[in-house]
A protein has these predicted regions:
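A short, N-terminal "cap"/entry segment at the start of jelly-roll beta-barrel domains
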Residues: 1-33, 47
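Glycine- and acidic-residue-biased ligand/ion/polar-headgroup-sensing regions
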Residues: 53-55, 59-65
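Short acidic-glycine-tyrosine-enriched beta hairpin
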Residues: 72-86
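Ligand-binding loop in jelly-roll beta-barrel domains
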Residues: 86-110
Length: 110
């Protein structure tokens, strides 16, 4: 199965999980997995949250920023992969002054 994100409407969620600005995403969900093409504008963030019943894998495709996972700050940029296991907490921040932070994410229900 192929997912064509260009055919999925982008939605913008302000202050996602308590973050700054808004989170823009194109999402595919089938009840078992959520697969997302996401984008954070400069200065935007996804707030700190815990994956109670899922994990998350994020594949960064453009821009730069950082994640804080279980209190550890880690840089991310195109080519980086971030994994947040079930039961752990993380946040994502685009600290670039002028470039969107783009990524694909997979959240399997566990």
């Amino acid at each position: 199965m192929n997912i064509d994100f260009s055919k999925i409407e982008e939605t913008c969620t302000p202050n996602f999980k308590g973050g700054e600005k808004y989170y823009a995403a194109r999402r595919y969900e089938d009840g078992l997995n959520r697969i997302t093409m996401g984008r954070l504008v400069p200065g935007a963030s996804i707030g700190l949250h815990t994956h109670e019943d899922s994990s998350e894998i994020m594949f960064f495709t453009g821009g730069s920023g950082y994640v804080v996972c279980d209190g550890e700050r880690l840089p991310v940029s195109a080519g980086s992969v971030h994994y947040c296991p079930k039961g752990h907490s993380h946040t994502l921040v685009n600290d670039s002054p002028d470039t969107d932070l783009t990524f694909n994410a997979v959240v399997p229900v566990q």
